[in-house]
């Protein structure tokens, strides 16, 4: 059984993420992104069924990036140190509360962006997302089905690489060891992969044309996606949670 977040229309989900990213870009206090990040993580873990271990594993790079932003803003911030905002002295570097606040705000903003992105990626089928863009956002079917076909080709290209590697071994080619040798071996794989991709794309295009695909928007769909009440409830709930985070931040700021 699919979790609630998996059932939301992909376009509505993307619109909610985009609105949150835009609004967070204009929030400079550290309390709003911190509160909103906690809400995002709790909501995704409860409503998407994502394992905590998997979430933490993908969060590690963004934690490192966020810590780098906090450190950079605290050490190299432009706000001058005064007796009112002075925190401590680290050798020749004076750390003040204003620069630390800016750094924490940037760090939590990065974590919010990453959490929203992972929520979308982990709970959205790419094929359904492209179909939703065609049906709800009037995206060109030619572009959408081209992207879908390219996405379907990715596993095939992986199999092609394995076949080329096995063919080289049969013909006496030495196995690549080390990063430099593997990078140089890519040159031998590029032309066969490119030729295979062109043949697959040509066959796919001919098959689509033979079945009557013209790229027109006036067509029927095997799988129809719609925006229903559940999707609007999700969109409004996300905006309300963001507004609630902002109101909570006002209480902390005061």
Curated annotation (Swiss-Prot):
CDD domains: EcfT. The keyword Transport applies. It is a multi-pass membrane protein. The chain crosses the membrane at residues 7-27, 32-52, 56-76, 110-130, 232-252. It is found in: Cell membrane. Pfam families: CbiQ (PF02361). Keywords: Cell membrane, Membrane, Transmembrane, Transmembrane helix, Transport. GO terms for cellular component: plasma membrane. Belongs to the CbiQ family. Part of the ABC transporter complex YkoCDEF that could transport hydroxymethylpyrimidine (HMP) and/or thiamine. Could also transport other HMP-containing products. Probably responsible for the translocation of the substrate across the membrane. The complex is composed of two ATP-binding proteins (YkoD), two transmembrane proteins (YkoC and YkoE) and a solute-binding protein (YkoF). This is Putative HMP/thiamine permease protein YkoC. The lineage of its organism: Bacteria, Bacillati, Bacillota, Bacilli, Bacillales.
